[in-house]
Design a protein with these regions (language model features):
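Conserved nucleotide-sugar donor-binding catalytic segment
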Residues: 122, 129-185
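A conserved acidic beta->alpha catalytic loop
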Residues: 22, 37-47, 89
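Cell-envelope/extracellular polymer assembly enzymes that use nucleotide-activated donors
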Residues: 2-4, 32
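Conserved donor NDP-sugar-binding/catalytic core segment of glycosyltransferases
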Residues: 97-130
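Glycine-rich, basic loop-to-helix element that forms the pyrophosphate-binding segment
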Residues: 63-80
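Short beta-strand/loop segment that forms part of the nucleotide-sugar
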Residues: 30-39, 60-64
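Short, well-formed alpha-helical segments that are part of the catalytic scaffolds
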Residues: 12-25
């Protein structure tokens, strides 16, 4: 199963190497990295082109004018070939078994599940962020998880690509940000 790791980036030349190194070290190699450069002016695009040449996984890079994260996500979804789609911001990085875990968990999910949620590490604190997730599969949505289960904190969401294609983020004139919850709830 192919997983799409998607990164929207804007002037993050200083954080991209750590992210790329975490992708190079993945134990499960059946993934692609799709990057939309949202109009960077700091040579991020040149760095991404160098990464593409040395990567041992497929890399797709698209350069667009600065339109904000959600427009970049919509572009990334259009380019995605994976069954699952994970947004990995340019200042994030993955545990070396992250994609392997995604692939493993996805094989055990009921067909009607639209995705998976994992906890993230707070880099500044060097600790796992937010409250623990339920130990068993839980059929829910982000609002219920937050209000009913009391689980807050930043999470790593992995959504079926077909759902992302069906429900793109809205794009508003003069607005560059739409919270993920607008679509995912």
């Amino acid at each position: 199963m192919l997983v799409t790791i998607f990164t929207p980036t804007y002037n993050r030349i200083h954080t991209l190497p750590r992210l790329f190194d975490s992708l190079l070290g993945q134990t499960y190699k059946n993934f692609e990295w799709v990057v939309v450069d949202d109009g960077s002016t700091d040579y991020s695009y040149r760095m991404l082109e160098r990464f593409k040449k040395i990567a041992d996984f497929p890399v797709t890079i698209k350069r667009v004018g600065n339109g904000g994260k959600m427009r970049a996500v919509n572009e990334g979804v259009k380019l995605a070939k994976g069954e699952y789609f994970m947004i990995l911001d340019s200042d994030d990085y993955l545990d070396l078994k992250a994609v392997e875990t995604i692939a493993d968990v996805s094989t055990r999910l009921p067909k009607h599940f639209g995705g998976m949620v994992f906890r993230k590490v707070d880099i500044a604190l060097n600790a796992i962020a937010g409250a623990p997730l339920p130990s068993k599969k839980y059929d829910s949505n982000p609002i219920e998880v937050f209000y009913k289960l009391g689980i807050g904190g930043d999470k790593a969401e992995v959504i079926k690509t077909c759902i992302m294609k069906r429900y793109p983020f809205p794009e508003f004139d003069e607005e560059k940000f739409v919270p993920e919850g607008y679509v995912w709830n």
